Amino acid sequence: MKLKTTLLGKTYVFQSVKEVLAKANEEKTGDKLAGLAAESAQERVAAKVVLSALTLGDLRENPAVPYGTDEVTRIIQDDVNEAVYRKIRGWSVAELREWILDEKTTSSQIRHLSRGLTSEMVAAVAKLMSNLDLIYAAQKMPVTATCNTTIGLPGTLSCRLQPNHTTDDPDGITASVLEGLSFGAGDAVIGLNPVTDSPEQVGKVLRRFQEIKERWEIPTQICVLAHITAQMKAVKAGAPCDLIFQSIAGSEAGNAAFGFNADTVAQARELLLRDGTAMGPNVLYFETGQGSELSSNAHHGTDQVTMEARCYGFAKRFQPFLVNTVVGFIGPEYLYDARQVTRAGLEDHFMGKLTGVSMGCDCCYTNHMKADQNDIENLASLLTLAGCNYFMGIPHGDDIMLNYQTTGFRETAALREITGKTAIAEFQQWLEKMGFSENGRLTAKAGDGSSLLF
């Protein structure tokens, strides 16, 4: 294993695989904050050169966090298909990149090979790709999952309807839900971030969602994005629930900071498969985002792209229906501007798809970040080309409860029309039955949620 290279007469020496991974990263303020970033563009290129020559075996043998001290590492390593890994362990990261991008390499071949990868390998190959590489590669890797409906099929683009409200008022929530449905949002999930994180409030909102779903016979999923334990208590108390949600991190310490561990997730999955309202096998929803481990001092000296890839390795164990990065939510301390947010969104989507999870993206930014709505529309457009499974849908893209900006109802509708994609088939049929869509396009009735009331 060679950890040095000479460029233009200057020799660059790296002390570990972890340092190579960090310094090969595209520029991120979070890595600078952690003291891990390359000090110059030249050092970044040198790290990429070294990384390109490392073998997949080198990366397997040097996980970001030791196996003996971290359950996320154990999950990632234990879930590797050893027969597949043995065939590729001698490949360099550069060879893996070339193989994925080769036009002769098929989706099924990539899916099979991905079973032999660890998250560090996934992160490594992402670091050697341009933005267009990430888009081209990701669109070769469709990933589907089934709850009440099946998400991720080619030709579809889905949307989470996010009817957040500042006081969790049921009527206010309902108004946002009906408006979103009329725009074609909500086929991925109708999912609310509650103000009050209690089992009682979770149950109250879930029952309202279930009433809406049953009254208008909507083929979709419902979820309230409270803490995982609050949702479990609500389900045990009899609340209807299709999906249980949790934010996840790429280390055991990061998950502990969120207040859960792998056993908690396993118990939630078992509970929902037994007592939930979903018809399919995929009953979990995870959110991630570059930099969350650093914010809880749980990054173990590892760069934020590698830690993000480890989130997907953890998620895969539990066969989720939905996984999405909330790409610009943490702020400029981790992703400084639109350029960094765009890069992170493309990286995250590619890494999730290569890992094998049903990957979406909350294309978003905070008010103090150097980004605006045009930048977020740019990212959503690029991710649509990349085959992203779903985006968020919030009234006018302005979340008045979480106080950040993301995509609205109209963006997904426009992107579907531009690319010839539709909502999930059963939901698309419902839209046409209700008069909101005709021949794959929204009608004049779209946007009038009150039409569902009369």
Model-derived features with residue positions:
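Anaerobic metallocofactor- and corrinoid-dependent redox/one-carbon enzyme cores
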Residues: 1-174, 182, 189-454
